[in-house]
């Protein structure tokens, strides 16, 4: 009988630990956000997942000064959803950090693709945006995510720039 009680308590502890698991999902165009995501995952003992575009971005795609570059065209169209290479199963996570570089003051459209692909599984999760940027804050990106996905439980975001 005592063995069963100990086993039940052990299983309950394992289930509680699984329910409290954390995922760090991120998109990184140049490696800056990837480095921040790795540090964040290590700090929180979290699983790391890279949100990758089906078609990788080239340097020309990322030229924000060129109105015809891929990133410029994507950001001009609020309905644009770049195709993701592969999705991850988010059902086992309670807390998910969502990371990205700031593009045009907000998250890149590939983040919308990832969120859209994972709805409604994200609806009972705690989502914490984090971003990297050379000059912008995260406030506009936070407001955009909360407005675009009002049914999701967003916490205040983190700006993780190298200083």
Residue ranges and their predicted role:
Residues 116-121, 146-150:
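Short, surface-exposed basic-aromatic patches at helix termini and helix-loop junctions that form
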Residues 128-161:
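Short, glycine-/small-residue-rich phosphate/pyrophosphate-handling segment
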Residues 18-98, 105-107, 116:
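N-terminal beta1-alpha1-beta2 submodule of the flavodoxin-like/Rossmannoid cofactor-binding fold
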Residues 35, 109-113, 139-143:
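Generic recognition of short, well-ordered alpha-helical segments
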